[in-house]
């Protein structure tokens, strides 16, 4: 169906007064979120978005006059300066938010397995979920991180973090990773 349509149903039924989500920075997602936010506003539902997938948003790391930085080295230097000046803390989920009523998700069938679709079984190269993400981060920080420059280019060894999927799908925060390193 249309992106965001399922999330609008509780609002249409008058079962919610606010919607919360983490910002996504891909062009298609930005447009989707803008449209959903407009629809929710028409229904009288407040929207609150949060920075989650990045440590600093593009608007937070700028040149001295506020312009976007053109060279990576300048961006990197400004990023680290900002990091050391602010060192954003990892925030726990507010207890007031944790106690809020959450609209139920619509019932759906589980996705079919690769075998059910006629393909060979798939072996996952990462384990999904927050617990596995944190274990992998701990393993990486305690070992391969210290020889990353060499290890990342050697396919025969497990020398990279393999955390990108966890960052992308929100099972690991970049702020947690930077604090761990």
Where are these regions (language model features)?
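Trp/Phe/Arg-rich N-terminal binding region typifying the photolyase-homology
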Residues: 1-87
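Glycine/tryptophan-enriched, flexible segments
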Residues: 66-181
């Amino acid at each position: 169906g249309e992106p965001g349509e399922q999330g609008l149903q509780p609002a249409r039924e008058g079962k919610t007064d606010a919607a919360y989500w983490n910002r996504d920075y891909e062009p298609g997602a930005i447009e989707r979120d803008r449209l959903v936010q407009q629809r929710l506003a028409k229904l009288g539902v407040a929207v609150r978005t949060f920075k989650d997938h990045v440590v600093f948003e593009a608007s937070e790391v700028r040149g001295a006059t506020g312009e976007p930085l053109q060279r990576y080295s300048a961006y990197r230097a400004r990023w680290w300066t900002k990091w050391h000046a602010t060192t954003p803390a990892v925030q726990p989920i507010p207890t007031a938010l944790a106690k809020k009523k959450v609209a139920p998700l619509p019932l759906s069938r589980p996705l079919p397995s690769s075998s059910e679709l006629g393909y060979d079984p798939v072996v996952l190269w990462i384990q999904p979920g927050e617990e596995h993400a944190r274990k992998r981060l701990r393993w990486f920080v305690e070992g391969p991180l210290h020889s990353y420059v060499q290890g990342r280019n050697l396919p025969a060894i497990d020398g990279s973090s393999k955390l990108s999927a966890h960052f992308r799908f929100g099972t690991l925060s970049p702020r947690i990773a930077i604090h761990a390193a």
